[in-house]
C-alpha cells in the first residue's frame, strides 16, 4: 500500500478526499480507492506507475474508454476513479464523479471539434458534401438535389441587408456547403443585379480558371475508355460542364472537388469585393474614448470575421488585440480581470464605462468620502429627517401595518401572493396594490359588445356587468349571441377606486373582491342599526350595521347591508359586487412580451411637443381618455424625462380624428429588428383550394403588450390650450402604431399563436401577412366554416378579435389588393382617372397603379409616363403630357378595359416563362403552366447602362423572372426566349461569367433578338488600318477628331461644344465612314473601346448610334487599343495632327500675365515657364526683352549638394550700409538683413534668429572679428551649432555665399527703384531670389528646394529608425493562392502597398493586405505570465 499511496501528496490528497462518489451522496474518495485502482490496473496489464501523472492518467483513460461499452461494472468503476484522479492532478476542482465525467466529455468534444476544424482547414474535406446537395438514391447512384428556395432567399436577403460587408463571406460559405458549381452559379445569379461586384467576381474567377488551366495542362491523346476527362477551369466554373459531369467528378475516387474549388475562387473574389466595400484591418479597430465597450466588441468581431486567418490566429487576436485596443478606462478593468476572462465577464465588467453615469459614479464615490464629515456638522439645525412610514396593508402613509385599522388583507403584504407571509417572501419590492401578480405581462384591452368572457384581455381586470343582473352570470352573453351590453372595465394597474352614491351622498370606495362586507367610514345613514364587531388587519373594529341600504355603483344599483365604522378606506365587498354582476377576469393572454432595448449607448427620445390647435387638443384628449380606459396607455408622472411629439389628422372621408405619434426619433434609437416576413405573398403562388375565407385581425397592434422596461420611452404629452395647465403625460402599454418594432413583434407573436392551430390542422393553409389572414382548405364548405370558427375561437383566447365586418365568407375575396375567385385571381378593379391637367403627384400615382396592374395585364408600358417625372419637380407642379405619353396612356386604358385573370399554381406541373421584346427597351413576360392560362405576368424596362444591346437586356429580364420564380414558387421556371441558339452562343462565349441563364428553348415570336454585328478577334490582313484620335479643350469646348491610315490617307475635322470622350468616338465614326467593307481601327481611348466591345445595338448617345449603324453595314471590323503618348507610329502622328491648335494654344493667354509678373519680380525664364505653362522659347524671349535683365545674362548656379544643416554667413556692403547674408548651402536659400554695425552682438542675434526659423547644425564664416567674437561662440554653444571658419584670404572657401552676395546685389539693382529704403529693397530681393527664380536641382525655386531637402532628411532619418526597429517585427503572410497563413518571417521593409520579408533566406515581396505584422516578444511569449506590450505596427 505504501508504494501506491505516493500517487497523491499533501494538498492533492486533501482535494481527493473532498470529492463525493456520487452527486449529493455522503461517501467520499479515500486513499483505499487509489490502492484498489493500482491493483486493478495490474489485472488489466497496465502500468500502475502511470497513476502518478496527468499524462499517465490520460493514457489510461485512452486505453479504457473504448472498452467501456462492453466492460464489466468493475471496469467502469476503475475508469471513473482514474478520471477523477486526472482532474485532481490538474488541480481542477470537481465536486463528484459525475462532474468529472461531464468535464471529460466536454474536453473530448472540444478536442474533436478542433481536429475537425484542422482537417477542414488543411483542404477540402473528404467524402461527400455536408449540406448534401448530392445524395445517394436507392440504386446507389449519386443524384443532385438542387438548392432550396429558403437557402437562396436567405442568400438574397443577406446581400440586400449587408451589401458586401465582411459577414457575407461566412454566410456564403455556410449556405453553399457542399454545393455543385451549378448551385453556386444559381446563387450568384440571384444577386446578379449587383453588377460592379459581379464584374469583380467574374474577373477573379477568370484569373483563377486561367491559373488552374496553367497548372493542369491537358494530357495529349484520347481519353482511355471508362476514364473521365479532367475538368478545365471553365468546367469548374460550371460553364462548360454538365451537372452530371460535376457530380461524377465530386463523387469519383479519388474525387475532384470541383464545387469546393469553385467556391474557393468565389470566396477569393468576395474577399476583394468586401475589401473594396469595407477596407478595415483588425489592427485599425480601436475603442473610441467614449465608445461603449459593447459597440467596440461588435465592431471588433465584425472585422475579425472578415480577416483571412486560421482559428488559432483569430483566437490569439481576440485574446490580445481586444484588450490592447480598448480605451484606457476599459483596459484598466480588463487587465484587472486577468487573462482568462470570458467575453461575457468582460462585457459585464465594462458596462457603462466611460459614459456619463460611470463618471458620475466615480465622482459620487469621491464626494462621499470628502463630504461625509461636513454633513454631520450641520446636523444640529434639525433633529434628523424622519423617515416616512407606509402601511403594507392599506397603502396609506403615517402608520405601520401593526397599527392599521383597515380589514386585514389576505396573503403576503410584500408581493400580494397567497400561501406565505411577508417574512418568508422572496420578492424584493412591495407590490401589493398593483395586482399584476398572476400575469407579469400584458394589458387590459377594449372589448366590443360581441366579445365573450373567455376573451381574456391581457391583465386581471374587474368587469361590472350592466343590465339585468338576475341572469345567472349573464349566461346568454357568454355564448356571444345575447344582448349587446358594453361593460365598464376597471383595470388593476391602479387601485380599483370608484365613485359611489349612498343615501344621496357621493363617496370614493375601493372595489374589493376579497372582502365579504361593505364597510364605509364617516357617513350618516337614516334608519336603524345594530352594533357589530368585524375582524380587520389591525385587530377588531366596532361598526354600525345598516340593512337594506341602496348603493349606486358605476350606474348599477344594488341593495344590501352596509357597515359604518372607522375603516381606513371605504370598501365595497362581495355582498354588493355580486348583485351588480361584477366579475374578476383573469386573462389567458400569455403573449410573452418581446424584450426590446435601445441601441447601445443611446437614450430615449426627448423631443418637445409642438403647439396644437384647440380642436386637435380636444380630439386627442378624447382619444387618449378612451385608450386609457382600455388599458392601451397609462398616465405617467414628471419622473419620466422622455417625450415624443403627437398630433392629430382627420380620417379619410370622415369628420373623425386620428391620433398620430411621430416616432421617428425613437425609431432611430430603437434596436434593429429582423423583419420576420421578407415580402408580400403573391396569389400566383397560392395552390387552388375548394373553400376559402379571408379574415382580418381587429386592433392588431393594440392586442400585443409592449415590454415593461421599454414603455417609458414611448411617453408623449397632450398639451393644454395656451399652456394654462401642465400637459397630460401618457405612455404606451401595447405596441404603438408607427413604432419600428411593432410589425416585427406583432408578426412573431402571430406566428407563435397560429403555430399550434397549424399543427393540429395540417390540411388548412393559412397565409398571414400582418393582420390579413387567407385561410384555404379542400374541405366542403360546412366543415371549412366550422374550422374557421375554431380558428377565431383560438385567436380570441389570445385576445385577438376577428370582426365580422371584415370577415369574408363568399368569393370574390379581397385580399392584399387582389381579388380572389375559386379558380382564378386578378388585381382589384383599377380605375385610371381622366384629367385635363396632370400634376407630378397624379402621374406618380398613375404609374404606381399601372405597375400594380402589370402583374396580370400583359403589355402594359410606363416608359414615356416615367420620362415626364425626370428632374426634380415639386409634387404639385403641372406636367404637360407628351404625345408618346398620351399614346402610352391610351394603349394602357385599352388593355385594362378587358378584365384579365390569373390562375393558381399546380405543384405537379412545370412552370414555363415566356419573354417578348416590346421595343424601346421594354420587355414583357408571362409565367404559366398551361398555355393561355397565366399564373402571373410582368414587365421589365430597366436600363442598367447607357449603351446596351438586346441580348444583355434579355439576360437581365431572365434573371429578374428567375428570382421571382424562386421567391414565389421556390423554383426556376423553364424559359422560352425569342433568340436563336447560335446568336446566344456567340454572345455567351464572350460573356459567360457575367450572365447565367437556366434551361431555355427558342421560340419564334418576332421581333427576334439578334447581335447586329461582330468584331473580329485578330487584325484583318489586307484591310486598311486607321489610327484614330480626338482632342478637346476644356475651357473653350473646341475640339478636333481625325485619322491617319497606313496607306497615307489622313483627315481632321473641327468640332464645337465637345469633350475629349466625344472626339474619340467621332474619330472612330470618321474611320468607319471613310473605310471599305473591311477595316482595322486602332484607338488610344479605353472609353471608346469599352463601349464598342460590349456590342451595343442602341444607345442614349447619338454618336454611338451612328457608329452602330456603320458597324452593321461592314462585313468585318477589327478594333484594337494602344496606350497614348508612347511613341507608337501611327498613333503618335495622328495625335500631333488632332492636337495642333487644341492642346498647345493654351499658353497664349499666359504670356501677358508672365510679362506683368516679370516686370514686378524679374523672375527667371524657368520660373515663368513652369508657373504660366509657357514654352521655354517664349519665356526666354520675355527675359531677353527686359532692359534690366539682359545686362549680364542668366546667373548660373548649379550647386553642389551638401548636407542639410550647413549655412554660410558673410557681410557685404551696399550704398554704405552693411548687409548680413546667410545662405543654405544645399538649396541656395537666402536670409539677409541690413545691420547697423559689423559687431559680434549683431552677428550673434542674427544667428539665433536664423536658428529659430530653420534647423541649423553648422555655420561656415570667414575669420572676421565679428564672427570670431565670444558672443557669437556663446550663441552657437547655446543653440547647439558647430562653427567652422574659411581659409584666410581665400574667398573660394566661402564660394557659395560670395556668389549669392553678387546675385542679391543684382536683384536689388533690378528692384531698387520700387523701394524708398535699402532695407525694403533687400527683403524684396530675398523674396524674389527664394520664390521667383527656378533652376538647379529639380528645377525648383530655392524656397521649394530647402523645404524639400529638410523633409527628405526627416524621412530618411525616420526610415533609419524604422529599419532598426523593424528587426523586432515578425510577419505572417499568405502566398498568392494558398489561403493558409505562413510565417513567421523577418520584416526587412514596410511600404504603403507591400512589405519585403525574409523567409528561410529567401527574400519575398508580399502585398500589404496579405501580410500581418506582429511584434516579436522573444521566448517569454510562451510563458503564462507574459504581458504583451504594444502590438501596433510602427
Swiss-Prot record:
Q: Where is this region: Interaction with membrane phosphatidylinositol 4,5-bisphosphate?
A: 73-77
Region (Dimerization of protease), start-end ranges: 488-492, 536-542, 575-587
Where are residues bearing Phosphotyrosine located in the sequence?
A: 132
Q: Where in the chain is the site Cis/trans isomerization of proline peptide bond? A: 221-222
The segments labelled Disordered in the record are 103-124, 443-483
Q: Where is this region: Interaction with Gp41?
A: 7-31
**Region named Dimerization/Multimerization of capsid protein p24:** 277-363
What is the reaction catalyzed?
A: Specific for a P1 residue that is hydrophobic, and P1' variable, but often Pro; Endohydrolysis of RNA in RNA/DNA hybrids. Three different cleavage modes: 1. sequence-specific internal cleavage of RNA. Human immunodeficiency virus type 1 and Moloney murine leukemia virus enzymes prefer to cleave the RNA strand one nucleotide away from the RNA-DNA junction. 2. RNA 5'-end directed cleavage 13-19 nucleotides from the RNA end. 3. DNA 3'-end directed cleavage 15-20 nucleotides away from the primer terminus; 3'-end directed exonucleolytic cleavage of viral RNA-DNA hybrid; DNA(n) + a 2'-deoxyribonucleoside 5'-triphosphate = DNA(n+1) + diphosphate
Where is the sequence biased in composition, kind Basic and acidic residues?
Answer: 103-112
Q: Where does Mg(2+) 1 bind?
A: 696, 771-772
Q: Name one GO biological process term.
A: viral translational frameshifting
InterPro entries, per the entry:
Aspartic_peptidase_AS (IPR001969), DNA/RNA_pol_sf (IPR043502), Gag_p24_C (IPR045345), Integrase-like_N (IPR017856), Integrase_C_dom_sf_retrovir (IPR036862), Integrase_C_retrovir (IPR001037), Integrase_cat-core (IPR001584), Integrase_Zn-bd_dom_N (IPR003308)
Q: How is its activity regulated?
A: Protease: The viral protease is inhibited by many synthetic protease inhibitors (PIs), such as amprenavir, atazanavir, indinavir, loprinavir, nelfinavir, ritonavir and saquinavir. Use of protease inhibitors in tritherapy regimens permit more ambitious therapeutic strategies. Reverse transcriptase/ribonuclease H: RT can be inhibited either by nucleoside RT inhibitors (NRTIs) or by non nucleoside RT inhibitors (NNRTIs).
Span(s) of short sequence motif Tryptophan repeat motif: 984-1000
The record's remark on the cofactor is: Binds 2 magnesium ions for reverse transcriptase polymerase activity. Binds 2 magnesium ions for ribonuclease H (RNase H) activity. Substrate-binding is a precondition for magnesium binding.
- Annotated active site residues, numbered on this chain, are 512 (for protease activity)
Q: Which residues form the Reverse transcriptase domain?
A: 630-820
Q: Give me the ranges of the annotated region Interaction with membrane phosphatidylinositol 4,5-bisphosphate and RNA.
A: 14-33
Spell out the Polar residues composition-biased ranges: 449-458
Give residue ranges of zinc fingers (Integrase-type). 1149-1190
Q: Which residue ranges does the UniProt annotation give for the motif Nuclear localization signal? A: 26-32
Query: Which residues does this entry assign to the site Essential for RT p66/p51 heterodimerization?
Result: 987, 1000
**Binding residues for Mg(2+) 3, per the UniProt record?**
1210, 1262, 1298
Integrase catalytic domain mapped to chain residues: 1200-1350
UniProt name for this protein: Gag-Pol polyprotein
* UniProt organism field: Human immunodeficiency virus type 1 group M subtype F2 (isolate MP257) (HIV-1)
Amino acid at each position: 500500500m505504501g508504494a501506491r499511496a505516493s500517487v497523491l501528496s499533501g494538498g492533492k490528497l486533501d482535494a481527493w478526499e473532498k470529492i463525493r462518489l456520487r452527486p449529493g451522496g455522503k461517501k467520499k474518495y479515500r486513499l483505499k480507492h487509489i490502492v484498489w485502482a493500482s491493483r486493478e490496473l495490474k489485472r488489466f496489464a497496465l502500468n500502475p506507475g502511470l497513476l502518478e501523472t496527468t499524462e499517465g492518467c490520460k493514457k489510461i483513460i485512452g486505453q479504457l474508454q473504448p472498452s467501456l461499452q462492453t466492460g464489466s461494472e468493475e471496469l467502469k468503476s476503475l475508469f471513473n476513479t482514474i478520471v477523477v484522479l486526472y482532474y485532481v492532478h490538474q488541480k481542477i476542482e470537481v465536486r463528484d464523479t459525475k462532474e468529472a465525467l461531464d468535464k471529460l466529455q466536454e474536453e473530448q468534444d472540444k478536442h474533436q471539434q478542433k481536429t475537425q476544424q484542422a482537417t477542414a482547414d488543411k483542404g477540402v474535406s473528404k467524402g461527400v458534401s455536408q449540406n448534401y446537395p448530392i445524395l445517394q438514391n436507392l440504386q446507389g447512384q449519386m443524384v443532385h438535389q438542387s438548392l432550396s428556395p429558403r437557402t437562396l432567399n436567405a442568400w438574397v436577403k443577406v446581400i440586400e441587408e449587408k451589401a458586401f460587408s465582411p459577414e457575407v463571406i461566412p454566410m456564403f460559405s455556410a449556405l453553399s456547403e457542399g454545393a455543385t458549381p451549378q448551385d453556386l452559379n444559381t446563387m450568384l445569379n440571384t444577386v446578379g443585379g449587383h453588377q460592379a461586384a459581379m464584374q469583380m467576381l467574374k474577373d477573379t474567377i477568370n484569373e483563377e480558371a486561367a491559373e488552374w488551366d496553367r497548372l493542369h495542362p491537358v494530357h495529349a491523346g484520347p481519353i482511355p475508355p471508362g476514364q473521365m476527362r479532367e475538368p478545365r477551369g471553365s468546367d469548374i466554373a460550371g460553364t462548360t460542364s454538365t451537372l452530371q459531369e460535376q457530380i461524377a467528378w465530386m463523387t469519383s475516387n479519388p474525387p475532384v472537388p470541383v464545387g469546393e474549388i469553385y467556391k474557393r475562387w468565389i470566396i477569393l473574389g468576395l474577399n476583394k469585393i468586401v475589401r473594396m466595400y469595407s477596407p478595415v484591418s483588425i489592427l485599425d479597430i480601436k475603442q473610441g474614448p467614449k465608445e461603449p465597450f459593447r459597440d467596440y466588441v461588435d465592431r471588433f468581431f465584425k472585422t475579425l470575421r472578415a480577416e483571412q486567418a486560421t482559428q488559432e490566429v483569430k483566437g490569439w487576436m481576440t485574446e490580445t488585440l481586444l484588450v490592447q485596443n480598448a480605451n484606457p478606462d476599459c483596459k484598466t478593468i480588463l487587465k484587472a480581470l486577468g487573462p482568462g476572462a470570458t467575453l461575457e465577464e468582460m462585457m459585464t465588467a465594462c458596462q457603462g464605462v466611460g459614459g456619463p453615469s460611470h463618471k458620475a459614479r466615480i465622482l459620487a464615490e469621491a464626494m462621499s468620502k470628502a463630504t461625509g464629515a461636513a454633513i454631520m456638522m450641520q446636523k444640529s439645525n434639525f433633529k434628523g429627517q424622519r423617515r416616512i412610514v407606509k402601511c403594507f396593508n392599506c397603502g396609506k402613509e403615517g402608520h405601520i401595518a401593526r397599527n392599521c385599522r383597515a380589514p386585514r388583507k389576505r396573503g403576503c403584504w410584500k408581493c400580494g401572493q397567497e400561501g406565505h407571509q411577508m417574512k418568508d417572501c422572496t420578492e424584493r419590492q412591495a407590490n401589493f396594490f398593483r395586482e399584476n401578480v398572476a400575469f407579469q405581462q400584458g394589458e387590459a384591452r377594449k372589448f366590443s359588445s360581441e366579445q365573450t368572457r373567455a376573451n381574456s384581455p391581457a391583465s386581471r381586470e374587474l368587469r361590472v356587468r350592466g343590465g339585468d343582473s338576475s341572469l345567472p352570470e349573464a349566461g346568454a352573453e357568454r355564448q356571444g349571441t345575447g344582448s349587446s351590453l358594453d361593460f365598464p372595465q376597471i383595470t388593476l394597474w391602479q387601485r380599483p377606486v370608484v365613485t359611489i352614491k349612498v343615501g344621496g351622498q357621493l363617496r370614493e370606495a375601493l372595489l374589493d373582491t376579497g372582502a365579504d362586507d361593505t364597510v364605509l367610514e364617516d357617513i350618516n345613514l337614516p334608519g336603524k342599526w345594530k352594533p357589530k364587531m368585524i375582524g380587520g388587519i389591525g385587530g377588531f373594529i366596532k361598526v354600525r350595521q345598516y340593512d337594506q341600504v341602496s348603493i349606486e355603483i358605476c350606474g348599477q344599483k344594488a341593495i344590501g347591508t352596509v357597515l359604518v365604522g372607522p375603516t381606513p378606506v371605504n370598501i365595497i365587498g362581495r355582498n354588493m359586487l355580486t348583485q351588480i354582476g361584477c366579475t374578476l377576469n383573469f386573462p389567458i393572454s400569455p403573449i410573452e412580451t418581446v424584450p426590446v432595448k435601445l441601441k447601445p449607448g443611446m437614450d430615449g427620445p426627448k423631443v418637445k411637443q409642438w403647439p396644437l390647435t384647440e380642436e386637435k387638443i380636444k380630439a386627442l384628449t378624447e382619444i387618449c381618455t378612451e385608450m386609457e380606459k382600455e388599458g392601451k396607455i397609462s398616465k405617467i408622472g414628471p419622473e419620466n424625462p422622455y417625450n415624443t411629439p403627437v398630433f392629430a389628422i382627420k380620417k379619410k372621408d370622415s369628420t373623425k380624428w386620428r391620433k398620430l405619434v411621430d416616432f421617428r426619433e425613437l425609431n432611430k434609437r430603437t434596436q434593429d429588428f429582423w423583419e420576420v416576413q421578407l415580402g408580400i405573398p403573391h396569389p400566383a403562388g397560392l395552390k387552388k383550394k375548394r373553400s376559402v375565407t379571408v379574415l382580418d385581425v381587429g386592433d392588431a397592434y393594440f392586442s400585443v403588450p409592449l415590454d415593461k422596461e421599454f414603455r417609458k420611452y414611448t411617453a408623449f404629452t397632450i398639451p393644454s390650450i395656451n399652456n394654462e395647465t401642465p400637459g397630460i403625460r401618457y405612455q404606451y402599454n401595447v405596441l404603438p402604431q408607427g413604432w419600428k418594432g411593432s410589425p416585427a413583434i406583432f408578426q412573431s407573436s402571430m406566428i407563435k399563436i397560429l403555430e399550434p392551430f397549424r399543427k393540429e390542422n395540417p390540411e388548412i393553409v393559412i397565409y398571414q401577412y400582418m393582420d390579413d389572414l387567407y385561410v384555404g382548405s379542400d374541405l366542403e364548405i360546412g366543415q371549412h366554416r366550422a374550422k374557421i370558427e375554431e380558428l377565431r375561437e383560438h385567436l380570441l383566447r389570445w385576445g385577438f378579435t376577428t370582426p365580422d365586418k371584415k370577415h369574408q365568407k363568399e368569393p370574390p375575396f379581397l385580399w392584399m389588393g387582389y381579388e380572389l375567385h375559386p379558380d382564378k385571381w386578378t388585381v382589384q378593379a383599377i380605375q385610371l382617372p381622366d384629367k385635363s391637367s396632370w400634376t407630378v403627384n397624379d402621374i406618380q400615382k398613375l404609374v404606381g397603379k399601372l405597375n400594380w396592374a402589370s402583374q396580370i395585364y400583359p403589355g402594359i408600358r410606363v416608359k414615356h409616363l416615367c420620362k415626364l417625372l425626370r428632374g426634380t419637380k415639386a409634387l404639385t407642379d403641372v406636367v404637360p403630357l407628351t404625345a408618346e405619353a398620351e399614346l402610352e396612356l391610351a394603349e394602357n386604358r385599352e388593355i385594362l378595359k378587358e378584365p384579365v385573370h390569373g390562375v393558381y399554381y399546380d405543384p405537379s406541373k412545370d412552370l414555363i416563362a415566356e419573354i417578348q421584346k416590346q421595343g424601346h427597351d421594354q420587355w414583357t413576360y408571362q409565367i404559366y403552366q398551361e398555355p393561355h392560362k397565366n399564373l402571373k405576368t410582368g414587365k421589365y424596362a430597366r436600363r442598367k447602362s447607357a449603351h446596351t444591346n438586346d441580348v444583355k437586356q434579355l439576360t437581365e429580364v431572365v434573371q429578374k423572372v428567375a428570382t421571382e420564380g424562386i421567391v414565389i414558387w421556390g423554383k426556376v421556371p423553364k424559359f422560352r426566349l425569342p433568340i436563336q441558339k447560335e446568336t446566344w452562343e456567340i454572345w455567351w462565349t464572350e460573356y459567360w461569367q457575367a450572365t447565367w441563364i437556366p434551361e431555355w428553348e427558342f421560340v419564334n415570336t418576332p421581333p427576334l433578338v439578334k447581335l447586329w454585328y461582330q468584331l473580329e478577334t485578330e487584325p484583318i490582313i489586307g484591310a486598311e488600318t486607321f489610327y484614330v484620335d480626338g482632342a478637346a479643350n476644356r475651357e473653350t469646348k473646341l475640339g478636333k477628331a481625325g485619322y491617319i491610315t497606313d496607306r497615307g490617307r489622313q483627315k481632321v475635322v473641327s468640332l464645337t461644344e465637345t469633350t475629349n470622350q466625344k472626339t474619340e468616338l467621332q474619330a472612330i465614326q470618321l474611320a468607319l465612314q471613310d473605310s471599305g467593307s473591311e477595316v482595322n481601327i486602332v484607338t488610344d481611348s479605353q472609353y471608346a473601346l469599352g463601349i464598342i466591345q460590349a456590342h451595343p445595338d442602341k444607345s442614349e448617345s447619338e454618336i454611338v448610334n451612328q457608329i452602330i449603324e456603320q458597324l452593321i453595314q461592314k462585313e468585318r471590323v477589327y478594333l484594337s487599343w494602344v496606350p497614348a503618348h508612347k511613341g507608337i507610329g501611327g498613333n503618335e502622328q495622328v495625335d500631333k495632327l488632332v492636337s495642333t491648335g487644341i492642346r498647345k494654344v493654351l499658353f497664349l493667354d499666359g504670356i501677358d500675365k508672365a510679362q506683368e509678373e516679370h516686370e514686378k519680380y524679374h523672375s527667371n525664364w524657368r520660373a515663368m515657364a513652369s508657373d504660366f505653362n509657357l514654352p521655354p522659347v517664349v519665356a526666354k524671349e520675355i527675359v531677353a526683352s527686359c532692359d534690366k535683365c539682359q545686362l549680364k545674362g542668366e546667373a548660373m548656379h548649379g550647386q553642389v549638394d551638401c548636407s542639410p544643416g550647413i549655412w554660410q554667413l558673410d557681410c557685404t556692403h551696399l550704398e554704405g550700409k552693411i548687409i548680413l547674408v546667410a545662405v543654405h548651402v544645399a538649396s541656395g536659400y537666402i536670409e539677409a538683413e541690413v545691420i547697423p554695425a559689423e559687431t559680434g552682438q549683431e552677428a550673434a542675434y542674427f544667428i539665433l534668429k536664423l536658428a529659430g526659423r530653420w534647423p541649423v547644425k553648422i555655420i561656415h564664416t570667414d575669420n572676421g572679428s565679428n564672427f570670431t567674437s565670444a558672443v557669437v561662440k556663446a550663441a552657437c554653444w547655446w543653440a547647439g551649432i558647430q562653427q567652422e571658419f574659411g581659409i584666410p584670404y581665400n574667398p573660394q572657401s566661402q564660394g557659395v555665399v560670395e556668389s549669392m552676395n553678387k546675385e542679391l546685389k543684382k536683384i536689388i539693382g533690378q528692384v531698387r527703384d520700387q523701394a524708398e529704403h535699402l532695407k525694403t529693397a533687400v527683403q524684396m530681393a530675398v523674396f524674389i531670389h527664394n520664390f521667383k527664380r527656378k533652376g538647379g536641382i529639380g528645377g525648383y525655386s530655392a524656397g521649394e528646394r530647402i523645404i524639400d531637402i529638410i523633409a527628405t532628411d526627416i524621412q530618411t532619418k525616420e526610415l533609419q529608425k524604422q529599419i532598426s526597429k523593424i528587426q523586432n517585427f515578425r510577419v505572417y503572410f499568405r502566398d498568392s493562392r494558398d489561403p493558409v497563413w505562413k510565417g513567421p518571417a523577418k520584416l526587412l521593409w514596410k511600404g504603403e502597398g507591400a512589405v519585403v520579408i525574409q523567409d528561410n533566406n529567401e527574400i519575398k515581396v508580399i502585398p500589404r493586405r496579405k501580410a500581418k505584422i506582429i511584434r516579436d516578444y522573444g521566448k517569454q511569449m510562451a510563458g503564462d505570465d507574459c504581458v504583451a506590450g504594444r502590438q501596433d505596427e510602427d
